[in-house]
Amino acid sequence: KKTILALFLVLNFFSYAQDQLNLNYYLPQGITYNPSVPTPKEVIGHEVGEWHVTHDKLMFYMQTLAEASDRITIENRGATFEGRPILLLTITTPKNHQNIEQIRQEHITLTESNSNVDISEMPIIVYQGFSIHGNEPSGANAGLAYAYYLAAAQGPEIEAMLDDMVILMDPSYNPDGLQRFAYWANTNKSINLVADNNEREYHEVWPGGRTNHYWFDMNRDWLPVQLPE
């Protein structure tokens, strides 16, 4: 009886923990957020981490953020072999967005040996890409909360940070692999989380979500640069 009671309490604890999941868990405390910028749940229908985000939901949220925030512009750089968009977000202050071409040209000038550019007021460029392997999904899922923070956080700290940098954000390096993995994991997920490594959810069928459409490991394309991703 004691064993059954203990098992019952453990199951209820994990069910309660799942029910308490919300965006505040991931965000810095003591910061106000622009209410006109939608949270991930308001757009994709679930909290960050409640389900593995599919690529279509990830892209929909990023496009929605770009429409809601003057800190974000979005560019479609092409499509994967399965036709999924390859998006790039540019995140900075509205002032930097107005001068983005000038900032780009100044950074190009820095590569010239005889350049004489004053870098004291030049914003730095930060490139961030997420989940190059589709079944390493924490990056793409964290990207939901991260992009929301950059778009909606208010106060002098975030304003100063974005004034000093231009963030280029690729929410998903490997859209086809991410979609393949998310479908598998969500399809085989239990209503209550299961930590047992033998659970079907954790064992994808071959080829899994690591690779792109042609089962190519994206880490092998840094030098040849032959794939659209």
Q: What is each PLM-predicted segment?
A:
Residues 55-96:
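A non-catalytic alpha/beta surface segment that caps or lines the substrate-entry region
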Residues 31-50, 128, 213-217:
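Acidic/histidine-rich, surface-exposed loop or edge segments in extracytoplasmic proteins
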Residues 54, 83, 131, 169, ...:
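Divalent metal-coordination and catalytic microenvironments
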Residues 3-12:
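Sec-dependent N-terminal signal peptides
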Residues 19-35, 89-93, 103-107, 113-123, ...:
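Surface-exposed loop and adjacent secondary-structure segments within mature catalytic domains
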Residues 13-17:
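Sec/Tat signal peptide C-region and signal peptidase I cleavage site
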Residues 46-52, 132-136, 214-228:
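The substrate-binding groove and active-site-proximal loops of carbohydrate-active enzymes
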Residues 83, 117-125, 129-138:
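Short HxH-centered metal-ligating active-site micro-motif
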